[in-house]
Amino acid sequence: MTSLAVGVDLVEIGRVHRLLQRHRDRFRSRVFTPAELRLCGDRAHLLAARFAAKEATMKALGTGARGVAWREIEVLPNRRGKPLLFLYGRAKERAQSLGLTGLDLSLSHSRDFAMATVVALQEEPPDDPQAERGWLMERLDAIR
């Protein structure tokens, strides 16, 4: 059986645009990796989508913004344009400690907003039917 954790975030593109105008270098270097910046430049809608993806990933990992650094989560497309998540440092350690087997990311944006949804997958070992039957029999015996 597979269990899921989901993170969702919505970002106002205008907010990212204002951050770029007021704190361009500090904001960019604190939040985005060099590869993300090469890909997106100063295009606020692309950076807002990546910002939302990082927030959604932190939620799916259960860490919040204080648990991992922004640049420990990287969002880059594959050759077909599908966004992929790359985890480093504490973000990667957290995913491994949770036993995550995959992270799936979806990005979308309109004129005013960018949003991201992250689904974290965790494979649970299949039930052992004999062990489950044994557990049930013990419970039934205890009831009598």
Predicted regions and their residues:
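Core catalytic alpha/beta fold that binds nucleotide/phospho-ligands
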Residues: 1-144
